[in-house]
């Protein structure tokens, strides 16, 4: 039991990436065989009864936290006020890379958006969800930085959990508003888990290399 827990702790990020890859592959295989609608229909049937004007307004606000302009605004604030030049560089690169990855993947799959619910008007293809991918990478990398910061543990965990909740709510908002299918959102989260782990490992190795150079 102790060995198992030690293995999980040591390889936690790689296990997340592996799980993300499996989920993404599962969804993609069913996309190509047109055998995925039952999953999206099941989720839609359990969400549609929640639709009401007040909740719609709430989710329209929540979804804006994954909006390009809002996240770019947050990025600019961090670039202006942040003191860690290394973090600012990697944070900006991360934002650009995941956006490009989303455009690339959408151009491959060319899945059309849902037509059953149209509480918000969106353009472009549906899979994988751009809001899900970019928000997960954006807030996820920010959470990684916070985790390794000098903040007190309660503050760290509060901010990390808060960002996790925001990302999940952004994903839910995309389904509720009819901008994406359930599998678009899960697909976006899963492939970003793979990307983010690889990117974090890359950043970590770069930082180690620089520390060795200084020594």
Model-found features: residue ranges?
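N-terminal transmembrane-helix/juxtamembrane module of multi-pass inner/ER membrane proteins
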Residues: 1-69, 107-109, 113-119
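Membrane-interface helix-loop-helix junctions at transmembrane boundaries of multi-pass membrane enzymes
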Residues: 2-12, 82-93, 156
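Membrane-embedded catalytic cores of phosphoryl/pyrophosphoryl-handling enzymes
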Residues: 3, 8, 118-215
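Hydrophobic alpha-helical transmembrane segments
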Residues: 15-16, 69-73, 88-93, 157-164, ...
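Alpha-helical transmembrane spans of integral membrane proteins, capturing the lipid-embedded, hydrophobic core
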Residues: 18-22, 91, 95-99, 189, ...
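Aromatic-anchored segments of alpha-helical transmembrane domains
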Residues: 22-27, 97-104, 165-175
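Alpha-helical membrane-inserting segments
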Residues: 24, 28, 101, 105, ...
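Membrane-interface loops
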Residues: 37-38, 80-152
